[in-house]
């Protein structure tokens, strides 16, 4: 099962439940779907949940758990980063807790790829610089395939493109 939800750089808005939209989509939505799938997967031999995250999680320097619905401190980039860090943390914790299942939970991120996710990005100089480092989608999907098919899994590893050596815990 691949758990992947992503919106990025969207203007501030809230869901009808009062959740900020980026966190609602990227974290709460994918977490809810993953938990709903667990019941179906628990009896499947050698099943695997691959959580798709983002290199953006590595840019969080200070954890924030409160005020995430506050428009006055909203930053599209930062909230995207938080949503991916929370998703990764959830996945690591879920993998520890479902020891009675035959299901593993792993995390992979594609690096910075040329995909439609950037269609709303800011055309500023910093984004033009980032654009120079984007890889093609086939390079980005390699860590997802590795996380999906590896015979031996490393616990709490983030599978990432080898070209940028982004491994380990965020």
Give residue ranges: language-model regions.
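Hydrophobic residues in the alpha-helical elements that line and stabilize the ATP-binding pocket
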Residues: 1, 33, 90
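N-terminal Rossmann-like NAD(P) cofactor-binding module of classical short-chain dehydrogenase/reductase
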Residues: 2, 23, 50
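Conserved NAD(P)H cofactor-binding loop of Rossmann-fold oxidoreductase domains
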Residues: 4-10
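NAD(P)H-dependent oxidoreductase Rossmann-fold/reductase module
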Residues: 6, 49, 54-64, 68-170
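Short alpha-helical oligomerization interface
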Residues: 10-25, 72-75
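Conserved catalytic-core motifs of eukaryotic protein kinase domains, centered on the activation segment
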Residues: 11-15, 44, 61-63, 118-119
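Glycine-rich NAD(P)-binding loop of the Rossmann-fold in SDR/ketoreductase-type enzymes
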Residues: 21-29, 82-83, 135
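Amphipathic alpha-helical dimer-interface segment in Rossmann-like NAD(P)H-dependent oxidoreductases
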Residues: 25-46, 57-62, 95-96
């Amino acid at each position: 099962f691949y758990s992947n939800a992503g919106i990025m750089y969207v203007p501030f808005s809230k869901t009808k439940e009062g959740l900020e939209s980026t966190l609602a989509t990227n974290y709460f939505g994918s977490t809810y779907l993953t938990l709903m799938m667990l019941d179906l997967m628990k009896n499947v031999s050698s099943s695997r949940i691959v959580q798709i995250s983002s290199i953006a999680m590595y840019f969080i320097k200070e954890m924030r758990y409160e005020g995430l619905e506050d428009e006055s401190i909203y930053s599209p980039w930062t909230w995207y980063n938080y949503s991916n860090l929370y998703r990764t943390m959830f996945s690591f914790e879920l993998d520890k807790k479902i020891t009675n299942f035959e299901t593993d939970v792993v995390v992979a991120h594609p690096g910075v790829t040329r995909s439609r996710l950037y269609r709303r990005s800011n055309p500023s100089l910093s984004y033009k610089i980032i654009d120079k480092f984007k890889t093609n989608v086939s390079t980005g999907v390699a860590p997802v395939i590795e996380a999906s098919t590896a015979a031996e899994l490393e616990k709490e590893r983030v599978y990432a493109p080898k070209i940028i050596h982004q491994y380990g815990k965020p």
